[in-house]
């Protein structure tokens, strides 16, 4: 543990960013690839199945929101406590995290199953897509707890200095999912039900992978993939006595996790509203196009989020240790990496939108293909400055100031985007939905640049005050 802490305190910031980014990015790439391949196989079933999966997508994103509520909050608090050299408190946070996940998973499952049909109809399903969406979700509901224990705990693993474990856990689930998707759709012809079972099994295996590491502290087998050896031992151990809920710990976790939770929840709710508006103006095909957009969007968001995750332990540790110069440098490097990642994504979308549409819907009509290409180019036209909307709010979470992140996230998703989309869709119908996104990205980027400028000045002032105290 001391070695990991020393590197966070002393090593080159850029070197640390790359070290933590690469395994997180590889894990994210596999997850995104799974997402794309999963939609690819669903698209092979039918356009209705693709649209149905698109409706279910935002429900699954609600599950992710709850995983982030506890997981991101726990990861941030663990980073800060380790920076303060409070290892025992960090282990208590881990125990409380497991308990919170178990309670949330059971409650969420019960609430969702009470009236699934109504939820789906309000989410943009229609008579054509409801059977597909319902079949998919009835199976996926069993994956809530495994999803919490796999995806949710990756933030804690990163905070504990074991990002490769988080990477391999995601890879185990995603690769299993991809293989089973192919078998289910192309070999067994089980339709959307088969893809749902593939997702369930993948999440279960990933959860087992993570939980074994946390409980045993190491792995029973040696793993070497592309030069990445999984030889880490856990600096945090799951102990039964730490699983009893502690109000101060839960409060700390939820206060920081509230920002990504609200962001993801707002994104999910806005997505459900968007689906309903798209279905009203564009029917099943409109929802299918929206599903394609939502299949590619994580390529950008997960890449930039990998940057945000990579700097979280660096910023959290150094902020707790009052190394403000290193905090400032890490923030600027993260902003640059986020902009660069988004720029690569933008170039690809602008160059080959036709191929991106046909990948999911090869039977698309000429008119439908034209509409899909137009939608992609408009929707992602200002995606580069949009990367700031991930990096900067996550920075505030990492430094234990969730209130700023909550305000920023709600401003973007609810106040700006939802309002703009409703107005634009009334004026330009389906095109209005596509134009609402870049308009929101532009306005929000201006707001974030102001916040970034103010924060950099604060960090400079804190560093100067610290140096003055040392001189005395």
Where do the language-model regions lie?
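Short alpha-helical transmembrane segments in multi-pass integral membrane proteins
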Residues: 1-24, 78-143, 187-257, 315-382, ...
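Transmembrane alpha-helix boundary and packing residues in multipass membrane permease domains
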Residues: 24, 28, 40, 57, ...
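Short runs within selected transmembrane alpha-helices of multi-pass transporters and secretion channels
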Residues: 71, 140-158, 166-177, 195-210, ...
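N-terminal transmembrane alpha-helices
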Residues: 8-40, 44-45, 61-73, 77, ...
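Small-residue-rich hydrophobic transmembrane alpha-helices
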Residues: 50-110, 147-166, 287-353, 386-408
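Transmembrane helical elements of multi-pass membrane transporters/channels
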Residues: 19-38, 139, 150, 173, ...
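Hydrophobic transmembrane alpha-helices of multi-pass small-molecule transporters
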Residues: 62-65, 177-181, 207-211, 298-302, ...
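Helix-terminus/linker motif at the lipid-water interface of multi-pass membrane proteins
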Residues: 29, 33-51, 120-127, 183-190, ...
């Amino acid at each position: 543990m001391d070695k990991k802490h020393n590197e966070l305190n002393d090593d080159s910031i850029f070197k640390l960013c790359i070290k933590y980014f690469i395994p997180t990015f590889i894990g994210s790439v596999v997850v995104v690839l799974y997402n794309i391949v999963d939609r690819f196989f669903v698209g092979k079933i039918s356009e209705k199945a693709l649209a149905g999966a698109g409706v279910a997508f935002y429900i699954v994103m609600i599950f992710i929101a709850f995983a982030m509520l506890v997981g991101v909050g726990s990861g941030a608090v663990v980073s800060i406590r380790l920076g303060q050299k409070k290892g025992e408190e960090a282990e208590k946070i881990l125990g409380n995290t497991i308990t919170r996940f178990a309670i949330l998973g059971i409650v969420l499952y019960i609430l969702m199953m009470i009236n699934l049909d109504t939820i789906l109809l309000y989410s943009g399903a229609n008579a054509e897509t409801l059977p597909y969406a319902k079949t998919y979700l009835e199976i996926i509901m069993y994956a809530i707890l495994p999803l919490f224990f796999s995806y949710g705990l990756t933030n804690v693993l990163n905070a504990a200095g074991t990002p490769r474990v988080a990477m391999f856990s995601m890879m185990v689930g995603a690769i299993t999912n991809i293989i089973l998707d192919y078998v289910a759709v192309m070999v067994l012809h089980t339709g959307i039900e088969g893809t749902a079972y593939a997702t369930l099994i993948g999440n279960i295996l990933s959860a087992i992978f993570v939980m074994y590491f946390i409980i045993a502290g190491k792995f029973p087998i040696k793993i070497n993939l592309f030069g990445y050896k999984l030889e880490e031992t856990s600096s945090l151990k799951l102990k039964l006595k730490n699983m009893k809920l502690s109000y101060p710990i839960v409060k700390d976790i939820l206060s920081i996790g509230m920002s990504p939770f609200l962001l993801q929840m707002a994104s999910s709710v806005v997505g459900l509203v968007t689906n309903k508006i798209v279905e009203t103006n564009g029917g099943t095909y409109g929802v299918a196009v929206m599903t394609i957009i939502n299949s590619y969007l994580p390529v950008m968001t997960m890449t930039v989020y990998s940057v945000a995750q990579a700097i979280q332990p660096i910023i959290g540790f150094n902020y707790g240790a009052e190394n403000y110069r290193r905090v400032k440098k890490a923030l600027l490097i993260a902003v640059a990496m986020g902009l660069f990642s988004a720029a690569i994504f933008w170039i690809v979308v602008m160059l080959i939108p036709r191929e991106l549409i046909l990948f999911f819907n090869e039977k698309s009509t000429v008119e439908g293909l034209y509409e899909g290409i137009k939608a992609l180019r408009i929707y992602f036209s200002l995606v580069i400055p949009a990367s700031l909307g991930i990096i900067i709010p996550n920075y505030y979470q990492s430094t234990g100031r969730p209130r700023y992140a909550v305000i920023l996230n709600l401003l973007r998703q609810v106040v700006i985007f939802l309002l703009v989309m409703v107005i634009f869709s009334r004026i330009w119908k389906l095109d209005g939905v596509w134009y609402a996104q870049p308009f929101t990205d532009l306005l929000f980027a201006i707001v974030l640049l102001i916040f970034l400028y103010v924060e950099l000045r604060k960090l400079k002032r804190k560093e100067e005050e610290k140096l003055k105290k040392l001189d005395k």
